[in-house]
């Protein structure tokens, strides 16, 4: 198949396969919404209180998938929270789990002073006022196998991140305003391809190690 004259984006999934898209994030997707604490994304551990210690916070997980799931682009997590002070941080880790074995497929992090997004710092009345943190994951392209689950864990910070400069206790609220949104890809009809293989002697020597 000749693809040299096609204008588009080459994308590699977390399973290693390559395909072509006209743009990224992709335009031909279907958005699905899972409510935190619902049957689709139920509580699986932890508590709804996030302390600034990187070790506390809620965990949510889907039931085992009934079919393979393909999604990509920029998943969103919109979550209602209350804080003790004007500040706080949420780190969201998204994982593909097969029983007790999980692999990292994406993450998001937000300084709650910017919970509406953008560069304008917001303010609110701590404890009494609920805010909705509109988080966006770093770009993902994931294939999740049938029978696996998706797990999302919330904490104050994650691996390779520093503690928040404005630490605060954060209380997560479940319900209709707290949702994980992902964009489903239909793999049928996509242009798949194998990238050129390296035949240099250095590559061949490395493969033989």
What function would you assign to each model-found segment?
Residues 5, 28, 104-106:
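Low-complexity, intrinsically disordered regions enriched in charged/polar residues
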Residues 21, 25-29, 34:
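Extracytoplasmic low-complexity segments
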Residues 11, 26-28, 199:
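Intrinsically disordered, low-complexity regions enriched in Ser/Pro/Gly/Gln/His and often acidic
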Residues 17-21, 135-138:
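Short alpha-helical segments and helix-capping/turn motifs at coil-helix boundaries
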Residues 35-209:
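Intrinsically disordered, low-complexity Ser/Thr/Gly-rich stretches
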Residues 18, 24, 172:
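Short clusters of hydrophobic/aromatic residues that line enzyme substrate/ligand-binding pockets
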Residues 6-16:
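Short phosphate-coordinating micro-motif centered on Lys-Gly-acidic
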Residues 1-3:
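Short, small-residue-biased leader/transition segments that mark boundaries at the very start
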């Amino acid at each position: 198949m000749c693809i040299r004259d096609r204008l588009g984006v080459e994308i590699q999934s977390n399973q290693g396969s390559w395909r072509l898209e006209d743009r990224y994030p992709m335009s031909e997707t279907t958005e699905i919404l899972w409510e935190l604490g619902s049957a689709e994304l139920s509580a699986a551990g932890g508590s709804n209180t996030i302390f600034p210690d990187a070790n506390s916070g809620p965990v949510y997980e889907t039931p085992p998938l009934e079919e393979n799931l393909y999604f990509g682009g920029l998943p969103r997590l919109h979550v209602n929270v209350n804080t003790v002070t004007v500040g706080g941080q949420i780190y969201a880790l998204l994982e593909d789990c097969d029983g007790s074995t999980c692999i990292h497929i994406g993450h998001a992090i937000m300084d709650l002073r910017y919970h509406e997004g953008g560069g304008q710092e917001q303010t609110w009345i701590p404890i009494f006022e609920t805010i909705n943190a509109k988080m966006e994951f770093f770009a993902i392209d994931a294939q999740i196998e049938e029978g696996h689950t998706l797990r999302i864990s919330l904490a104050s910070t994650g691996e390779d991140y520093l503690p928040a400069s404005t630490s605060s206790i954060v209380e997560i609220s479940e319900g209709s305003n707290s949702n994980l949104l992902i964009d489903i890809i239909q793999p049928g009809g996509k242009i798949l391809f194998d990238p050129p293989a390296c035949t240099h002697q250095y590559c061949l020597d490395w493969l033989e190690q």
